[in-house]
A protein has these predicted regions:
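A generic hydrophobic-helix recognition signal that picks specific residues
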Residues: 15, 66, 314-316, 403, ...
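Alpha-helical architecture
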Residues: 22, 71, 319, 408-409, ...
Length: 961
């Protein structure tokens, strides 16, 4: 007989009372008897005499006063007569039956003779089961059923549930309960006693757990011409159901002999998996079953609180269904763990029940003992239990919200009215990713439809129709830069194809699932499903073939320069490689001093392997519906860093546990802000935006704090804090970094310290640091703005004195050498800005990727000066403060007084020895189209960029009428 162990973890309530977190752990991996492999059809083992109740003594001083009960109906016939009829139709052609088939027909005929008209009805055994439970409840707690007891009984409107209730109540009377109990069966109660939500129904409809065995042997044993059986898997499962139900109807008919042990276990496993996914506590179901049980729990909680307030003794008895009981256990957090699924014969046999027995002491403290199928799984304070369930309700609502946000926003071309007006080419794409990641983690695990790391090409576009694999990406999300140090993993069947264009395979968005913690896609031509979950430095891939076929895993690093390294260790089943990172903008094409190092670990036997240029492949012997698991780790330091990250972050995880961990990280990040709105689309939009706010900057350091030195690549020693990189500051200083100071202050401080560290290691505060390098990619000096804002907002966990030193250097000094300046150090065109109070059109700003854009630079430098001034004032640098505040008025120098809009302005032209023209404006009257002195936009919106002085700009417009 299968053994069980009940794990009870003790804690303390109110300093002295024991409470218990409930854990129910099977010791064995599969049932040992055919009856147990019936799963939810397993006849209640206590009534059968196979097992015994296990009641635990209450702590000293506590006496029982109330029982809250929810029971599944007892043993029944198969739910519908039509299921018997459908099976029997296959045996009508006796000429097609084997000798065993003819024997089975006789047995099925006998079953049908008794089953006809009884589909779904309670059997005599089912009634006995409930009488037995009632008898033991009465005998264990007789004082709860006295004449003055307050007892209620409710059932689902389904006949077998009401019959179970009547049998239960009848036995209470037999035992001596003198209290008259009304048996209530009301359709209004279905909203809580047997509720199934629309999202739960949808989950049931989309869940299709495969049978992990071929039905071929089974069908051939029964039919001479197996081809006449059109749904062989369904027939095997339906006959298995009838066979399992024989223990519930007591006909003395057995069908177990027609199944092999492997077929029995495969059916058992399929049913367990399906029930676990649809009703259990697994991350894949997005918390839907638990949310479905909330109304039932609320009824239980309200009834219990009423009983406590009322005083006296009593019981609330409820009779429903296995699915509702299972969802209730899920919501309550009663862990019912198996290896990959729960065991329905242990949790939900016929007549399964949860009894919550309430105890009270003289001080009025209330404890609850939980009895699952009449076995104690511990005591807990009622207050603590209510809080635990409330916390779980909160968690499952957050999980729902996490799964509801749309990760695809920004992956298609813009379709707004202004699309194409201010942006062009790649600027008309949102350039986002539907990636799996930890908030601000090192890697984005994203689907790939574009095979390049080149500038302005995101890895994934929604309008593409061919899927190339899952990329480990370091794309600068939302921008037009480059990916770097990446690799892509593809899963194929059939012919081995190495080139990305060759292995590209059709996919449909209807067969994609994309969440921040999980991505999955079905690839119909490959006959497989590919899934990925991940954390900051690591990921787990799960490839599930749909048929027996070799599965090829192709991994390539996406080096457009054709550089890199690959090695395969077949004994250890590992792949290691690195993809060198190259700079763009300043130092275009040069090595950045870092590599994307990665490690891939396989666990299945490798059938074949090979390396071809920048590709490596592993071939496995794929078995239908048996997942192939691969684990990956990365590092920007070296191979050892990747190995350490692997050991710390992923080695001890399975797919589901990592998925759950990453989901929790996202819940923690997103619900630093709780929003409510009757319009759920607006709520989803908000959290989707917050998801996209959590990509950059990324973690560059390893789990031990090691990181590549900025602008150098030398491996720096372990540090207790994270080192961040990829600050696309022109995009993020206005809103993103101020947001971090509010929702993630510790991380905000680490990010600011990372900027200070870059200054210390590189000599200059960077402008737009990406791929661990100086870039000067965009305009402004906005690291200064972010640092000042963090300090003013109360962030102190960074070296703000050193930060001010760096900010002041950028604001007042220009690099002494052209090499430093060309490398991206210092403000662009600072000399012109300081000389004229603006950057004139004559200064072409040649040592920058974005050349010209003089007016925009002036406006942005004025804002940066204002920001640096605020930190100067806070640190007592009065002289600097006054000078910088004077310079912060420079925005006025590029506002054309004739139009009120910003405009291009020339350097002053000498009219005579003592007179200049003061610097003439372009007098532009086209306010809605791009101009070379404006950055990626038009004067109609760039006029407003100097945020602290929007009021002054507005007054200027009013003067223009």
């Amino acid at each position: 007989m299968k053994q069980r162990v009940y794990n009870i973890v003790m804690g303390v309530v109110k300093g002295f009372l024991p409470f218990y977190l409930f854990t129910f752990l099977p010791l064995t991996s599969k049932a040992q008897t055919n009856e147990q492999m019936g799963g939810v059809y397993y006849a209640y083992p206590i009534e059968s005499g196979i097992e015994k109740p296990q009641l635990q003594s209450a702590p000293e001083g506590y006496k029982p006063f109330y029982i809250s009960h929810y029971g599944r109906h007892g043993s029944r016939w198969v739910t519908n007569d039509n299921r018997y009829i459908w099976v029997n139709q296959h045996f009508e052609d006796q000429k097609n039956l084997t000798p065993l088939g003819k024997s089975v027909k006789k047995r099925l005929d006998q079953v049908w003779k008794n089953a006809k008209g009884n589909g779904g009805k309670l059997t005599a055994l089912g009634a006995r089961q409930h009488r037995g439970i009632a008898k033991r409840m009465y005998q264990n707690f007789p004082l709860l059923f006295t004449a003055d007891a307050h007892i209620t009984a409710h059932s689902s409107i389904v006949g077998r549930c009401r019959s179970s209730m009547l049998a239960f109540l009848g036995e209470l009377v037999t035992q001596g309960c003198s209290q008259k109990i009304e048996a209530i069966t009301d359709s209004a109660d279905m909203a809580w006693i047997a509720y199934t939500s629309p999202e739960e129904k949808a989950l049931e409809n989309r869940t299709n757990v495969p049978l992990r065995i071929s039905p071929e042997r089974f069908i051939k044993s029964l039919f001479i011409d197996p081809s006449k059986v059109k749904e062989p898997v369904k027939l095997l499962l339906e006959i298995n159901t009838i066979a399992s139900d024989m223990q519930d109807v007591e006909l003395g008919v057995s069908l177990y002999d027609i199944f092999t042990p492997e077929e029995m276990h495969a059916a058992y496993e399929k049913n367990n998996r399906g029930m676990t996914i649809v009703h259990g506590d697994v991350i894949q179901n997005e918390g839907i079953p638990a949310r479905c049980a909330i109304s039932l729990w609320q009824r239980i909680e309200n009834d219990a609180d009423a009983a406590i307030a009322r005083g006296g003794v009593g019981a609330d008895l409820r009779f429903g269904h296995d699915s509702n009981l299972y969802r209730l256990l899920t919501l309550m957090g009663i862990e019912l763990r198996g290896e990959e699924y729960n065991y329905m014969d242990e949790i939900l046999p016929m007549a399964a029940n949860l009894q919550m027995v309430f105890y009270r002491n003289a001080q009025g403290d209330v404890l609850v003992q939980l009895l699952l199928n009449e076995k104690s799984i511990g005591f807990m304070s009622w207050k603590e239990l209510k809080q635990q369930v409330a916390d779980r309700m909160h968690y499952f609502e957050h999980l729902r919200q996490l799964c509801a946000l749309n990760t695809m926003v920004g992956t298609a071309p813009a379709n707004t009215k202004t699309a194409g007006l201010f942006g062009k080419g790649s600027e008309e794409h949102g350039q986002t990713l539907p990636a799996v990641l930890s908030p601000n983690g090192q890697n984005f695990w994203t689907p790939q439809t574009q095979d390049t790391e080149n500038k302005c090409v995101a890895p994934y576009y929604y309008t593409d129709s061919l899927f190339q694999g899952i990329r480990n990406s370091h794309w600068i999300v939302g921008g037009c830069t480059q990916d770097y140090g990446s690799f892509t993993l593809a899963a194929l069947s059939g012919k081995l194809r190495l080139e990305p264009e060759e292995r590209a395979t059709p996919f449909s968005h209807s067969e994609e699932v994309s969440h921040p913690h999980y991505y999955a896609v079905r690839l119909p031509k490959e006959h497989l499903k590919l899934e990925v979950t991940g954390s900051s430095h690591t990921a787990i891939f799960r490839i599930t073939p749909e048929q027996d076929s070799p599965i090829h895993i192709v991994l390539n690093h996406n080096s457009d320069e054709g550089e890199g390294y690959l090695e395969v260790d077949t004994m250890a089943k590992t792949i290691y490689g690195y993809n060198p990172v190259h700079r763009i903008y300043q130092g275009w094409g040069e090595r950045a001093g870092i590599d994307g190092n990665y490690l891939l670990q396989a666990y299945d036997p490798i059938k074949d392997y090979g390396i071809d240029s920048l590709c490596v492949w592993l071939t496995f012997e794929g078995k239908a519906f048996e997942p192939i698991i691969l684990k990956a780790a990365t590092s920007f330091t070296n191979k050892r860093g990747a190995e350490n990250n692997f050991a710390f972050e992923v080695e001890g995880h399975d797919f589901e546990s990592m998925m759950a961990q990453t989901a929790q990280q996202w819940i923690d990040r997103l619900h630093t802000i709780d929003v409510e709105d009757p319009d759920t689309a607006r709520v989803n939009q908000f959290y989707g935006a917050l998801y996209r706010c959590s990509f950059l900057p990324r973690e560059m350091s390893d789990v031990d704090g090691s990181y590549p030195k900025f602008a150098d690549g030398t491996i720096m020693p372990e540090s207790p804090r994270k080192f961040y990189g990829d600050f696309s500051m022109w995009d993020t200083y206005r809103a993103l970094h101020p947001l971090y100071t509010l929702i993630a202050p510790k991380e905000a401080g680490d990010m600011m310290q990372s900027l200070v560290t870059m200054y210390e290691e590189g000599g200059w505060l960077p402008i737009f640091p990406c791929w661990n390098s100086y870039t000067a990619a965009m305009i402004g000096d906005h690291c200064s703005a972010a640092l000042a804002d963090a300090y003013i907002k109360g962030i102190r966990n960074f070296d703000y004195e050193k930060a001010y030193e760096a900010m002041r250097k950028n604001a007042f000094e220009t690099p002494a050498s052209i090499e430093e300046y060309a490398n991206g150090m210092g403000r662009r065109a600072l000399e012109s800005y300081l000389k004229y109070g603006y950057i004139p059109l004559e200064d072409g700003v040649r040592e920058a990727f974005h050349q010209e854009e003089q007016t925009s630079r002036t406006l942005e430098y004025a804002f940066d000066d204002f920001a640096v001034a605020q930190l100067a004032k806070a640190l007592g640098k009065e002289q600097d403060y006054h000078e910088l505040m004077r310079r912060s008025e420079n925005w006025r120098n590029v506002i054309n007084p004739k139009t009120g809009y910003c405009d291009g302005r020339h350097a002053p032209k000498q009219l005579s020895r003592k007179k200049t023209d003061g610097g003439l404006f372009e007098n532009n009257l086209d306010f809605i189209h791009r101009k070379p002195y404006i950055t990626e936009g038009a004067t109609c919106h760039y006029t407003w960029v100097c945020t602290p002085e929007c009021g002054g700009i507005g007054r200027g417009f009013r003067r223009q009428g």
